[in-house]
Amino acid sequence: MAGAKEIRSKIASVQNTQKITKAMEMVAASKMRKTQERMAASRPYAETMRSVIGHLALGNLEYKHPYLEEREVKRVGYLVVSTDRGLCGGLNINLFKKLLADMKEWSDKGVEVDLALVGSKAVSFFASVGGNVVGQVTGMGDDPQLSDLIGPVNIMLQAYDEGRLDKLYVVANKFINTMAQEPKILQVLPLPPGDDEELKEKSWDYLYEPDPKTLLDTLLRRYIESQVYQSVVENLASEQAARMVAMKAATDNGGNLIKELQLVYNKARQASITQELTEIVSGAAAV
């Protein structure tokens, strides 16, 4: 059994770690609330854009935009949204597992895969496992801006415009609630038809001003940017929630470990006192 002094040192070490994890839990909770507000503010715009695009995809368009046309799939692109920091449980690894499974399905069909990465965890992961990375951005912090994402988005859109990509997906965690975050793979190109039954029951015709091409070129690009930005914001909210839960679990585990070490310390202390008393009694008997 370890000595009482050594056990006391371990208890102090765990207590110091527990203070750190408790502070990180509180910081993550504060950041999560702020990110939830940002996510709630941007979600109506993203959902409205998705609804409008759903109408367009099912409508009788005067001008058929390339983003609305299905084509033979020879190469697909994934814009992968991960975190810049760790200590958020299995958030990133669960996302990567889902992505790798989807990539394997395409690879089994002989389809090539390109990757544009957001977040240092995705960059380090694919540097380890391999993959055709065509663009990346890291260090966006807790207040991501759309301008930070323009680089990877432009790379993928240019590849699609030039016919080097036939499908484009955004891969990110969807924020369900504080305790649940779900990895999602969202197809953004070609634009999927709306799955709302109300959309399918109605025929939508449009009058375009100034002209269909100019309007659709602008609108569809705004749509893609909104979906990518919303995915980044939701992934950030998921990160803070997962980190808060992970740090709470670490703090609770630290408390349990301290209790166990305290019991061991008490036993060691009791054994030490018993031994000292035995030595005193033995010495007195010898005299």
Curated annotation (Swiss-Prot):
Q: Where in the cell is it found?
A: Cell inner membrane
Q: Which UniProt keywords apply?
A: ATP synthesis, Cell inner membrane, Cell membrane, CF(1), Hydrogen ion transport, Ion transport, Membrane, Transport
InterPro entries listed in its UniProt record: ATP_synth_F1_ATPase_gsu (IPR035968), ATP_synth_F1_gsu (IPR000131), ATP_synth_F1_gsu_CS (IPR023632)
Q: Does the keyword Ribosomal protein apply?
A: no
Q: Which GO terms describe its cellular component?
A: plasma membrane; proton-transporting ATP synthase complex
* Topology relative to the membrane: Peripheral membrane protein
GO biological process, alphabetically ordered: proton motive force-driven plasma membrane ATP synthesis
Q: What is its main location?
A: membrane
- What's one GO MF term for it? proton-transporting ATP synthase activity, rotational mechanism
Matching entries from NCBIfam families are given as: ATPsyn_F1gamma, PRK05621.1-1
Q: Whom does it interact with, and what assembly results? A: F-type ATPases have 2 components, CF(1) - the catalytic core - and CF(0) - the membrane proton channel. CF(1) has five subunits: alpha(3), beta(3), gamma(1), delta(1), epsilon(1). CF(0) has three main subunits: a, b and c.
Family, according to the entry, reads as follows: Belongs to the ATPase gamma chain family.
Tell me, in a sentence or two, what this protein's role is.
Produces ATP from ADP in the presence of a proton gradient across the membrane. The gamma chain is believed to be important in regulating ATPase activity and the flow of protons through the CF(0) complex.
Q: Spell out the protein name for this chain.
A: ATP synthase gamma chain
- Give the organism, scientific name: Proteus mirabilis (strain HI4320)
The gene it comes from is atpG
